[in-house]
Amino acid sequence: MGLSAHNKDLMTDRRTFFSAAAAAAAAATATPLAVAAQAAPRQPLLMPRRLQPGDTVALINPSAAVYERQPYEVAHDTLKALGFKVKEAPHLRARRGQFAGTDAQRASDVNAMFADPQVHGILALTGGSGGNRILPLLDYELIRRHPKFLGGFSDITALINAVHARTGLVTFHAPVGVSEWNDFSVSHFRAAVMAGESPTLRNPKSNEDALAPKSNRTFTVRGGKAQGPLVG
């Protein structure tokens, strides 16, 4: 049985509608990081200089606002214990709703700390949310001209991945300023960021009083050797 012209028009309209809806959904779910990564050709690797005691590390906050005094004190004390001088980005303590200042303020802090010749490394104070909102506002060419350590994790992942994708700068998944910098974290940070050593990833020693520890057990999914860049 054939279709009438009216039914054919309805089917065409439905196909057009669903195609447009799918395209709109894909565009709506595309994050600034995904757009930045897709738009940028692969960049040659830029290695930041190793941090050394006496260097100045800037604290930035690209994400959530911090409402108490203690997190700032902890971040300062931690970096000083590592041997660094500490500089706060101009809007580190700013607040705008749930974020640490406006998008423009948070982005300008990132740009300014990369441009500052007195700053040798940049560490995020905390994570949270909102870091992806500043990615289109970053000056990636400026960052490429002034490569330096950039570290953080959680919501800061968007920032460090976007900077790497757009500039080639090797960035670091690292504790943020308010993290608990235990022996495990400090030893890996010093090895990778200060000594330039290739890290060996292993679980911390267990303090369980048992012949066969139950926590943090590891197993091999598929044995063998692999080689390649570690990104993510």
Locate each region found by the language model:
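C-terminal segment of N-terminal export signals and the immediately downstream linker at the start
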Residues: 32-66, 70
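N-terminal small/polar loop signature for handling phosphorylated ligands or for N-terminal nucleophile
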Residues: 90-147
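Glycine-rich phosphate/diphosphate-binding loop of Rossmann-like nucleotide-binding domains
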Residues: 70, 76-78
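Conserved anion/nucleotide-ligand pocket segment
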Residues: 172, 176-232
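Short, acidic/small-residue loops that bind anionic groups at enzyme active sites
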Residues: 140-162, 170-177
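N-terminal secretory signal peptides and thylakoid transit peptides that target proteins
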Residues: 3-25
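Mature catalytic domains of secreted/periplasmic carbohydrate-active enzymes
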Residues: 91, 136-138, 160-170, 179-180, ...
